[in-house]
Amino acid sequence: VEPLAPHEKVYVDSEFAEDENHGELGCEECHGGNPEDPNWKTAHEGVVKDPSYPDASSSCGQCHEDIAEHYETSLHISLAAFRKVTENRLGSDPAALDALSQAREAHCSGCHSSCGQCHISRPESVEGGLLEAHLFQKRPPMFQVCTACHGSRVEKEYLGKNAGIPPDIHKEKYFKCNKCHTAQQMHGDGNNYGNRYEVENGPKCIDCHEEIYSDKSENAAQHNDHKDKLSCQVCHSMPYKNCYACHVGKDDQGLAYFKTKGSILNFKIGINPAQNEKRPEKFVTVRHVPVDPNTFKFYSDIRLKNFDTLPTWKLATPHNIRRQTPQNKTCNACHGNAQLFLGKNDVKPEYADANAKVIVPPEMVPPKVDE
């Protein structure tokens, strides 16, 4: 997404004052400050740029109490998944945890998204700025908010920006993010989830494609044969981005940065590392995440001592769904095709232990069938 011009970031349209809901509020009722003070410097004392972060109860929560009640458990606010995985890999050393906290504050916290950073302004991670001159957006605009943050993977997959890979079939049907990812999911439900795949009201393909197992479906036999054995993406997604070896730090001016050793487009089927009642499938698509034992080494020489406790190939739900794909063109396009599956040779020897439960041994690759 293109950065906004300086004046665009702060311009408030007079039309906002005519809003029958939010326009009736004085600026100070959300942002603080003293409108009665004739001195502009002292009048701005206590002014808050984003009244909805880190606590929305005194701003949005005054009217939207039912949503603000669950605010802190929304993964967009809590970033619980990042805390969980980094602390699991790091261990319990207090000094290391303190250094990790500094690293998270410098790098991870910029990815949170508050009420305001979806409904009023762009997220801070893309330099912020008002969306529509401070007019509240009930439905956050997809390209200025959703893909502004979820750009390198989701946007490129969904819009077909990866070379040689077509866009998601749902994009061709003009679906926006909220068609699958509802407000209820985004706002949280009060439960402290460890990652997005645990969210109870998260999207499921079957929510819309409920007929695929019925006799009326032309592919009912294939869908029933593979039910609970494969995730939908195993058959219906295309190659997606996999990143490697991310390292974070600060430059000479104290500005946070990150760099990786690159990325590749690939497609791999692995053993489900998060198999549960909600996701019972044995085989799922897996994506390589760019964590490295020395990702946070810049900060007090942190090394992720328990690196092998979690895989570097994680459960993935790529946003490049197609009805027909190379792997579902025929049965034996997948059956007996070991190259589609995450094998021992796809993983560096030093990461073999971390991915032991995800790697598909040769004997588990489905054999060829008579077609």
Where are each of the predicted segments found?
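C-type cytochrome heme-c attachment and multiheme electron-transfer modules
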Residues: 1-126, 135-371
